[in-house]
Amino acid sequence: MANAVGKITQVIGAVVDVQFADHLPEILNALETNNNGNRLVLEVAQHLGENTVRAIAMDATEGLVRGQTVTDTDGPISIPVGNATLGRIMNVVGEPIDEKGPVATDETRSIHQEAPAFAEQSTSSEVLETGIKVIDLLAPYAKGGKIGLFGGAGVGKTVLIMELINNIAKVHSGFSVFAGVGERTREGNDLYHEMIESSVIVPDNLTESKVALVYGQMNEPPGARMRVALTGLTLAEQFRDQSGTDVLFFVDNIFRFTQAGSEVSALLGRIPSAVGYQPTLATDMGAMQERITSTKAGSITSVQAVYVPADDLTDPAPATSFAHLDATTVLSRAISELGIYPAVDPLDSTSRLMDPQVLGEEHYNVARDVQGILQRYKSLQDIIAILGMDELSEEDKLTVARARKIQRFLSQPFDVAKVFTGSDGKQVPLAETIESFKAVVAGEYDHLPEGAFYMVGGIEEVKAKAEQMAADAA
């Protein structure tokens, strides 16, 4: 049967109503029309009655007119998948946007897939080493797990996700997928050029590239921002099922997925829920997050940045994502104001791997001791603010001194932030991190000044910096 053809009856911003004479397209079907020479894809969202469907546009609708013909593709949005997508940048509907010609593959896959069945899923408790001290020690990531980076505006989510790409994706033997969801175009451009510089993308020989990029940035209509995370996820699923290896899936930013869903929901006339979000918030998030999973064929390790509106972790959008994650790294404005980067909150960040049977007794005990000292320092801060340090007992003074050293030792220079800090990035092996913090907690370095612990890698650098500081002071 020939594909059904309809006519546009109404255009309301990113929402388009299309009337079909006989055969109505199904919900989630992709419709196509020609907008001034450009292919415009619409996705069916509602059946309105009288043979009319309401669809969401995946690109700008300026130029559409009533009466214009629209064709039903008879299936959901499908994108090119497989090795031909490596080294390429695609948009939400799988069109290349890197000016390197079409994606050379006939293999396509619908962006709407069922989550793997319960029997197909697999879990692992293997630690994914990142080389970042505060993460490896206090909230370790699981291979094949879901990781969330939570933070307000400007506390360093994107820098941290870039550093994780730098540390993990470069040494990672499998494939990576990066989905830029509703973030700055400049950051997407910077990331692309950084990947070329570090040979993760090889422009002259794309088959040697290890990453596929999918962008739906801030300037795109809400339909594109709502669906681009699914486009990236579809690529990652295909790599997992085809290669059977561990696929890395980076999303920046998952909040924009929710935000776009809220815009679309309002355009479709649904009654808003708490704080103006869509009533289907938990369903939308669950449908996507359940697909990001490890199966017996291979695994997906996902790192998702989550913007926290007004630094409020109880906002429905970040609160809904918490339930789906294996590890949460919370970035704190108070810590970033101290100049400590990465501004990870060591007391708020969590991981399901925080268990002596997974990490081993030594790692677990050191992590808990570090958190214990920091927690004691936090509870003493009110007393210090009112009465000053002199009113503390000798034991508490020692706790505060160690806590301040630990706090500074949890900072670390990043490769991707070299342009801001002027110092080379450092990666610290997990064994060295555990050993160093064990010694600091035990008081072996009580004689060193706290300034020596700031923005360094391992403990040897602390000693060298302390000597340098002593020499400069002499």
Swiss-Prot record:
Q: Which residues bind ATP?
A: 151-158
Please give the catalytic activity noted in the UniProt record.
Answer: ATP + H2O + 4 H(+)(in) = ADP + phosphate + 5 H(+)(out)
Say if the entry is tagged with keyword Ribosomal protein: no
Q: How does it sit in the membrane?
A: Peripheral membrane protein
**Care to name a GO molecular-function term for this sequence?**
ATP hydrolysis activity
Which keywords does UniProt give here? ATP synthesis, ATP-binding, Cell inner membrane, Cell membrane, CF(1), Hydrogen ion transport, Ion transport, Membrane, Nucleotide-binding, Translocase, Transport
Q: Provide the E.C. number(s) assigned to this enzyme.
A: 7.1.2.2
Record localization: Cell inner membrane
Report the Pfam families cross-referenced here.
ATP-synt_ab, ATP-synt_ab_N, ATP-synt_VA_C
The highest taxon in the source lineage is Bacteria
InterPro entries xref list: AAA+_ATPase, ATP-synt_VA_C, ATP_synth_F1_bsu, ATPase_a/bsu_AS, ATPase_alpha/beta_chains, ATPase_F1/V1/A1_a/bsu_N, ATPase_F1/V1/A1_a/bsu_N_sf, ATPase_F1/V1/A1_a/bsu_nucl-bd
- Asked if Cell membrane is a keyword of the record, the answer is yes
Name the major location: membrane
The terms describing its cellular component in GO are: plasma membrane; proton-transporting ATP synthase complex
Record's function text? Produces ATP from ADP in the presence of a proton gradient across the membrane. The catalytic sites are hosted primarily by the beta subunits.
Q: How does it assemble?
A: F-type ATPases have 2 components, CF(1) - the catalytic core - and CF(0) - the membrane proton channel. CF(1) has five subunits: alpha(3), beta(3), gamma(1), delta(1), epsilon(1). CF(0) has four main subunits: a(1), b(1), b'(1) and c(9-12).
Q: Which PANTHER family match?
A: ATP SYNTHASE, ATP SYNTHASE SUBUNIT BETA, MITOCHONDRIAL
**Family the UniProt entry places it in:** Belongs to the ATPase alpha/beta chains family.
Protein's recorded name: ATP synthase subunit beta
